[in-house]
Structures are given as C-alpha cells and as structure tokens.
Amino acid sequence: MQLPIELKQAIDNNAFCAIATKINEKEVQNHLMWVDYREDRILINTEQGRKKTKNIRQEPNISVVIFHPNDMYTCWEIRGVVENIVQDSSANDHIDYLSNRYSGKPYGRSKDVTWEEAGFTSREIWEIDVNKVISMVSRAQSKSEPE
C-alpha cells in the first residue's frame, strides 16, 4: 500500500509515533517511538531483547499511530505486519541516523565515541508492510453532542 505524501512529510519532519504490540490475548503494550520509512514500508528501530521484540515475534501484527509534528490532532493510524526484522550493523547505523535527525547527535553518546566503545545493546529494525492507513485530520474543537 502506498503511504500518503503528507504522512511521509510528517515523518521527515520528526513526527513521533505510538506503537502497539500484543503481549497476550488480553494485553497490549504501547510505546512512544521515533519513526522512519523506506519506500512504502514503515520502519521502527528498537533495542534487541526488549519485551516488544518478543511480542512482535509472537504476533507480527502491529498498530502504529503517527502524530503530525506541528498538530497532534492530525495523525495517521497504520495497521500492518512486521514482515522483516533487520539485525545487522545497519540497524545501529539507522538509530544514529534517527538520533541525529531528532536530537542533533548520535544515539546516547557524543560524536567522538563509537557504537562499540559505548557498549550499547545492538538494535533491530522492524520493516512494516502497511495494510491500512487511516488519516485523521485536525478540525476545530467543538463540544461533543450527547449520544
């Protein structure tokens, strides 16, 4: 599925997202994350060995809500499936790219310290095939009518 250009522009301008992964039949886990895309796949970068990495391996379906960086009432809900998990050094490079984009410096360290010197746990990238995009556009706030 093709991602809307407005969504790609929001991501390029440092939109944040909330991801939801399924823990079990009764529980869902949510996280606020940085987000990226490649072509028409959503990319999520996370530390290997986290609870959410276990969740996604048990149930690869995922929901991602991406908030417009200048208007939190404009957002996109992405429903999709994690189709590929990248676990090589490119995932570490990718988190540095995201950290530079979002915060102006490499991930969790100064520019003169390498990934290996910092002793960080390796990263992984989830490549999400998008099945559905629901756009929610900001509109003037009004009182809700009683149901």
Regions found by a protein language model. Give the residues of each.
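Alpha-helix boundary recognition
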Residues: 11-12, 57-58, 119
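Short beta-strand segments
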Residues: 14-48, 56, 63-66, 76-78
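A short beta-turn/loop motif at secondary-structure boundaries
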Residues: 25-27, 70-72, 116-120
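Extreme N-terminal tail/first-helix region
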Residues: 1-17, 145-147
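Charged, gly/pro-rich active-site loop segments
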Residues: 2, 75-147
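Short, surface-exposed beta-strand-loop junctions and turns on beta-sheet-rich folds
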Residues: 50-52, 71, 142-143
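Short, solvent-exposed aromatic-acidic interface loops
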Residues: 47-51, 102
